[in-house]
UniProtKB/Swiss-Prot annotation:
Pfam families attached to this UniProt entry: AMER
Protein name: APC membrane recruitment protein 2
Lineage: Eukaryota, Metazoa, Chordata, Craniata, Vertebrata
The family this protein is said to belong to: Belongs to the Amer family.
Any GO MF annotation of the entry: phosphatidylinositol-4,5-bisphosphate binding
Domain of life: Eukaryota
Organism this protein belongs to: Homo sapiens (Human)
GO cellular component, one term: plasma membrane
Subcellular location field: Cell membrane
Compositionally biased tracts (Gly residues): 7-21, 126-137
Modified positions (Phosphoserine) in chain numbering: S162, S229, S233, S355, S358
Record keywords, A-Z: Cell membrane, Lipid-binding, Membrane, Phosphoprotein, Wnt signaling pathway
Comp. bias (Low complexity): 342-353, 447-458
Amino acid sequence: METSRSRGGGGAVSERGGAGASVGVCRRKAEAGAGTGTLAADMDLHCDCAAETPAAEPPSGKINKAAFKLFKKRKSGGTMPSIFGVKNKGDGKSSGPTGLVRSRTHDGLAEVLVLESGRKEEPRGGGDSGGGGGGRPNPGPPRAAGPGGGSLASSSVAKSHSFFSLLKKNGRSENGKGEPVDASKAGGKQKRGLRGLFSGMRWHRKDKRAKAEAAEGRAPGGGLILPGSLTASLECVKEETPRAAREPEEPSQDAPRDPAGEPAGGEEVPAPADRAPARSCREAEGLAHPGDTGARGEDAAGHRRAEPGPGEVRTAEDASRTGAVPVKTVPLVDSEGGSGRAPAAPDPASVDPPSDPSADRICLMFSDVTSLKSFDSLTGCGDIIADQEEEAGPSCDKHVPGPGKPALSKKNPGVVAYQGGGEEMASPDEVDDTYLQEFWDMLSQTEEQGPEPQEGAAKVAAALETKVVPETPKDTRCVEAAKDASSVKRRRLNRIPIEPHPKEEPKHPEKEQQEGVPNSDEGYWDSTTPGPEEDSSSSGKKAGIPRDSYSGDALYDLYADPDGSPATLPGGKDNEETSSLSRLKPVSPGTITCPLRTPGSLLKDSKIPISIKHLTNLPSSHPVVHQQPSRSEMPRTKIPVSKVLVRRVSNRGLAGTTIRATACHDSAKKL
């Protein structure tokens, strides 16, 4: 019956050899090779065939003969078939001695090819079934059941076959027809598919194993390792699950292989033993230790050795890939003690370390980037100053200059950038020194003014600390930044138009003086040359303050008018907060609501930004503005003390405007 099935289904065997090969879990266990035809012929009979393998050997030879002839034709027939046939032939030659030994006929070569392709497919089939996840348990039980688990093996094989349905459907359908020629053709196709599939699957399986590591970490039950190599997983599962029982079975399995191979020559022993353990190792190992796997297969405790070998080899291979060999090996040992599936679970843990290196690299990269960013922030690069502001702390947060302060020496440039709206940036480096001096002067004057002598002293100390210890740690810098924020606040206050000052009539004349002075100022705030009237009229307090920086100018605004200075400070303090807040929004100075005195109207509360743009008109109409105060000095109280801005605007007509401003100043003073 087997013979007839073998011959009748001989083509089916050869073509279905893929199925039989996949089914070869049992056949592989039987390994006699005679069961190939029987196994391929019937999945159900697969187990029986495993039992009948000895009797099936001769028929298998005949079957292979027919298949080989047909396959030969196939090989010569088509280019692709010939290529695959050549591959098969070459493989057959490589295993040819084994084939001859087994079938004792040259036709056996075809059988060997079929068996090889079947075996090679087996791992894939096992991989498929194992990859199925559900299939994995099935392969495990069949393995545990040994030949007796043929039904389970058949189911697992069926799964694997269904997985390969794309390549095998044609051959299977032809096999189902049972036509020897068609079957052989299908067999050739299938063989071609098997060979190509094996080649592709082999590499693919390696990839699978590589992915299996990750998949193992993700799905310990997935057992991609088993898919990696059915034989390796088979051995691992068998040995590991019930190692005591499995070891005997594996030796027995080896025994059948050895007898099957040895009858004609000892070559078969290395071939089957190597083929199962070594192939499992090679497939699992991904060519990590092919020779070692063979040696393991040959070991007396051999299969146990081989089983751990494949697992270990696989692990070693994966480890070599990931570079975490020791970690994976340990999990494998534990898993071996536990179960065949356990290795997958431990491997995930071991697999994680490999991913960790990449994560570590990423982290390192990020840390490098972060360090670069922090370095940039330390260097005070543009936006990063803002980041430093955040770093500096809440104290710095409220004031843009605060961030600038945390930026150490960059604090002043930062302040300049934010406060001046870019205007003060003309001399950021110089600003630091000038700021220090001006701060001292301003603070000292503030103290003299008496409204906030304590505050001035505190701010002086704060400014001093900030200046003295710009390189202190970040915490100190934050504290200092807070202090600086207050000092900067004052600076801004000085520079910001203070409404209380305008309320004071003397201030208006001062404004006029300022307007005259701006004419003399060629630069923004840098003009150190006071206006002609400035020196004469309000040189008392102006002289002490350097005109270089806007803070000095602001001081002019605050203290230039001796009459308004005493009252100026009180209002100044109040406005200090408001003005500093308004300064905090340098982007939109126009938002500051300041009673703006335009030439057309005496008093006008306008939200027009107090900027040179609007004040530009003032220089030409300064006389009007000045005379307006003469008409009613109280209205002048509403004039914003944003003379600094006006000065900048009036830079255009320095001489003429200065003269006009001087005349206006004199008239205003007279008034």
